[in-house]
Amino acid sequence: MPLQKIKFLSASRPKWISICHCRMCQKVYGNPSAIFVAFEKGYLEFVSGSPKFYKSSDIAKRGFCSYCGSPVIFSYETLDAVFVGTLDDPENWQPNGCHLGVESQIPWEIIHDSLPKYRTEDDPEFKEVNSKQ
């Protein structure tokens, strides 16, 4: 079973749970989208093991389990996000934030909710919403 070597806890509720459709996430995770649970920087703690990190872009680094290879986390300057599939109870973490990177959304992946949609994270509208959440 994947991700047995890394365990983490958070001292707070997540800032949001969102879905990313960008090409980077598609390629890194091998899926049309990635669902992540985002926490303000400093609230996520690794209590067993720790991910191995690499710089994936100018604005983020990503971490994975060096034992099983599972993607675990990505980190921006102000937040850390873990992937819902790494959680013990993923069914309890329904997206409530937004859809990101919709310019790269694969056409057959149909969005069935009314969450806000943003083209990219450098979109001024996204930055404004992000700063208020």
Tell where the protein language model's regions lie, with residue ranges.
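A short Gly-Trp-Pro
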Residues: 2-133
